[in-house]
């Protein structure tokens, strides 16, 4: 048996106890309350989308208030006891209390009023290479410290940690540029596919026009032939002559399609 007062640590926190209130009966009760509140002055029910604030303003029993969704967080939220920020802006290392080992991106000088020349961007690749070399050097120094004075490892481990954080921050600064380049490549590929489809349709159109022109020319020759044959067949009825003309035209079309 487990000792009283002993707690067990798990990888994920247990669900909050309010899940016990999410029963089919409670859900139906909440739905009935919403239907009653949506009635108009004439007593008819109106279809309405309820917001969390509107649901909280209704007279709901305490056991049903857990079924009302909370307000959507606008700035930050908490997950597993850790506060997360909804902002997509990458915070600087100084804001996180970490020593920055590379210079910050230069900002345009607004005081001088000379905004015609843009500021030169930071050479991220150069500083990434320097940090990588510093990591190799610090690792060799760390191995040397472990072989001579293992108890003095903490300062060197902190230096290596700081170098890794700076390298990752530089890589994260490349994310917007990577997203733009990926979008450009996708749009260029889509444009190339569209141009290829247009060229294929133009080619098919030219082939169809050529076939139609050839059919029109052959049809004119067939028409003159039919007129000459009708003069020789004055005793033949028009109803008997139509199938022969159609058969001759279909023979021409079949020969064209076989080619």
From Swiss-Prot:
Question: A Gene Ontology molecular-function term?
Answer: transcription coregulator activity
* Compositional bias segments (type: Basic and acidic residues): 31-44, 230-242
Q: Pfam family example for this protein?
A: Med7
List localization entries: Nucleus
Taxonomically, the superkingdom here is: Eukaryota
Biological process per Gene Ontology, one example term: regulation of transcription by RNA polymerase II
Does RNA-binding count among this protein's keywords? no
Family named by the database record: Belongs to the Mediator complex subunit 7 family.
**Name of protein:** Mediator of RNA polymerase II transcription subunit 7
- Name of encoding gene: med7
